[in-house]
Amino acid sequence: MTATLAAPSKTRRVVFPFTAIVGQDEMKLALLLNVIDPKIGGVMIMGDRGTGKSTTIRALADLLPEIEVVANDPFNSSPSDPEMMSEEVRIRVDSQEPLSIVKKKVTMVDLPLGATEDRVCGTIDIEKALSEGVKAFEPGLLAKANRGILYVDEVNLLDDHLVDVLLDSAAGGWNTVEREGISIRHPARFVLVGSGNPEEGELRPQLLDRFGMHAEIRTVREPELRVKIVEQRTEFDQNPHPFCDQYQTEQEALQAKIVNAQNLLPQVTIDYDYRVKVSEVCAELDVDGLRGDIVTNRAAKALAAFEGRTEVTVDDISRVIVLCLRHRLRKDPLESIDSGSKVEKVFKRVFGVVDEA
């Protein structure tokens, strides 16, 4: 992937620039790390209404570099990576048939709350399959989201079964649709982003655990910052193009940083002692399973790559461990300390980090 950020064309819908978003650093970091390494497993963003969740996610999708896709392919198939090719494209590659390649923006797919399983996964036209002997597949939202971002607002209100389907595809990278003995399989590798307001209900713990990271966001309380945010939004709404032009240099720099991190990621290593200590933290917090250990290691590596380093430091782990573990702790109604502080406390003890005076 190469950096390809151009100034927004006058015909394309203008999106609020990612680098202009004030505060919400925890959410921004979680999103960036998932883009650098999608295997982290997505991010769940829980917080107050009107805190810029949707704005930030759209801004991230707009910031990302263009990707190469096979022309007229409904699955955004990669022309070079077999893991991201549909069956038809793979057959064409194997037979050395020339492919028409185009560049396109990373797709961001919004999943509506009322979506059905057929709309999400796609459907097979049985009549056509039986009468014409062809696999007539109508791709769903998972096909459209391949190699992009799938955003579910109010994910805590979505049907549990649909959340399961999304998490299975995000984890495995493939979507399988079966009906009447006919089976279709296509790549569905995307960054899953869910957001919601905890007042409207929590996700079941088994589903929550499947999200790689969990960011909590709060309404900005400082009056000066609130005024700055309101002024920025007003300026953007009145003159979007000049406003975006002010941030073009910062946007290009961040995009280049993301691309460099993606290229550097395979070379990043994490010391054995640090890995043992991460597992020690997870064990002490009584985290079920090993997802917490795996995701923390991946996120720390992605952060090191983002900072341009090939070795993970204690500071990298410190910045990601709360995001990776806070939603995996068992809820204790009598506990007065919140889960993030609990993770931080155990991390400092295990890693021997002393609070600065």
Swiss-Prot record:
One of its GO terms (molecular function) is ATP hydrolysis activity. Its EC number is 6.6.1.1. The keyword Cytoplasm does not apply. Keywords: ATP-binding, Chlorophyll biosynthesis, Ligase, Nucleotide-binding, Photosynthesis. Pfam families: AAA_lid_2 (PF17863), Mg_chelatase (PF01078). It catalyses: protoporphyrin IX + Mg(2+) + ATP + H2O = Mg-protoporphyrin IX + ADP + phosphate + 3 H(+). Pathway: Porphyrin-containing compound metabolism; chlorophyll biosynthesis. GO terms for biological process: chlorophyll biosynthetic process; photosynthesis. ATP binds at G47, D48, R49, G50, T51, G52, K53, S54. Gene3D superfamilies: Magnesium chelatase subunit I, C-Terminal domain, P-loop containing nucleotide triphosphate hydrolases. The keyword Ligase applies. Belongs to the Mg-chelatase subunits D/I family. PANTHER family: MAGNESIUM-CHELATASE SUBUNIT CHLI, MAGNESIUM-CHELATASE SUBUNIT CHLI-2, CHLOROPLASTIC. Involved in chlorophyll biosynthesis; introduces a magnesium ion into protoporphyrin IX to yield Mg-protoporphyrin IX. This is Magnesium-chelatase subunit ChlI. The gene is chlI.
